[in-house]
Design a protein with these regions (language model features):
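Non-catalytic, low-complexity flexible loops and terminal extensions
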Residues: 2-14, 120-128, 132-209, 242
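Short, small-residue-biased leader/transition segments that mark boundaries at the very start
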Residues: 278-282
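Hydrophobic residues embedded in beta-strands of well-ordered beta-sheets
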Residues: 69-71, 112
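Alpha-helical scaffolds flanking conserved acidic
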Residues: 112, 219, 243
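Intrinsic-disorder/low-complexity, polar/charged segments enriched in Ser/Thr/Lys/Arg/Asp/Glu/Gln
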Residues: 30-32, 111, 197
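Acyl-thioester-dependent acyl-group transfer interface
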Residues: 1-69, 78-104, 208, 232-277, ...
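Acyl activation and transfer enzymes in specialized metabolism, enriched
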Residues: 38-57, 115-131, 197-235
Length: 287
């Protein structure tokens, strides 16, 4: 039986509400995950794998619409098409008044790219989708092999589309702490089409080992490295302002949720640093 999705709609979750109004040519609010394989991608098999994946995650069949007072997501029977990569990474996906899907699957040589407009999902939801997409592709590409399951069969469509913000929101307001104005990085702000990309490949095992040696998580270690990198660029005469970093936190680590919609929040880190001549051990952090 064919599923009827055309009349289904839902409000944007709490974290997604800011994205539609803030998106534009200078900030597309698109992020990318990719998977690098060891052989060239076969486009026809990737297309079939995408269609199989979409059957299990109808939340990705939604388009963004603008109502009288707010934006909302509406489910549409639009085909998702795989394309060979041609545009710069994280190019614009959401175009106002255009009924288009809010993600794009592309490929380049041995790489499968998955780009998504942030109003649709967060990093956790996007990673689950990409994992199943790659799994379906490998099963089609190598039917003689056995692959482990990515998705839990017990989870339902309702679980994936749950607005966990509404479910766990208590209405309790915490007292806000006053924050000092942070140091602003200087430099030329490039248009999206002129974006410069620096790609760095790190050994996950090596990074985890470094983080463990410092007694912190990988997230904390990388955040500290980024703060230190900013610190090194600050003129010593302007060290009075703190270096601030906004780190996204996956709320699924604190509340039970299988939702593939946005369920995250920010943690603000502010570091007031004094200039000292760094020792070789200190500089190892930036490596």
């Amino acid at each position: 039986m064919k599923k009827e999705h055309s009349s289904r709609w839902r409000k944007l979750d709490n974290a997604a509400q800011a994205f539609p109004a803030a998106t534009g040519k200078k900030d597309t609010r698109v992020f990318r995950f990719y998977c690098q394989l060891k052989e060239d991608i076969q486009a026809d098999l990737l297309q079939k794998a995408l269609e199989q994946t979409m059957e299990h995650y109808p939340v990705f069949s939604m388009v963004l619409r603008k109502g009288l007072f707010w934006f909302y997501l509406e489910q549409r029977d639009l085909p998702a098409k795989v394309e060979e990569e041609k545009r710069p990474p994280c190019s614009e996906i959401y175009v106002p008044d255009h009924k288009t899907l809010l993600f794009q699957v592309s490929y380049y040589k041995t790489r499968i790219n998955f780009e998504v407009f942030h109003a649709l999902t967060d990093g956790t939801g996007a990673m689950l989708f990409l994992k199943e997409l790659v799994s379906n592709y490998l099963i089609l590409r190598h039917p003689e092999e056995t692959f482990s399951k990515v998705r839990e069969d017990m989870l339902t469509e309702t679980d994936f589309e749950e607005d966990s913000f509404s479910q766990y929101y208590t209405g309790k307001k915490n007292e806000k702490e006053k924050s000092r104005p942070a140091y602003q990085i200087k430099g030329e702000y490039l248009e999206q089409e002129e974006m410069e990309i620096t790609e760095i490949l790190l050994s996950a095992e090596a990074v985890h080992k470094c983080a463990k040696a410092h007694g912190v998580s990988v997230t904390a270690y990388l955040a500290a490295a980024l703060v230190y990198a900013v610190y090194e660029e600050i003129p010593k005469s302007r060290l009075k302002k703190p270096v601030s970093l906004m780190v996204p936190a996956n709320l699924r680590n604190f509340f039970p949720s299988a939702s593939m919609t946005n369920f995250w929040s920010w943690i603000e880190i502010a570091c007031c640093l004094l200039y000292t001549s760094p020792s070789p051990r200190d500089r190892s952090l930036s490596r």
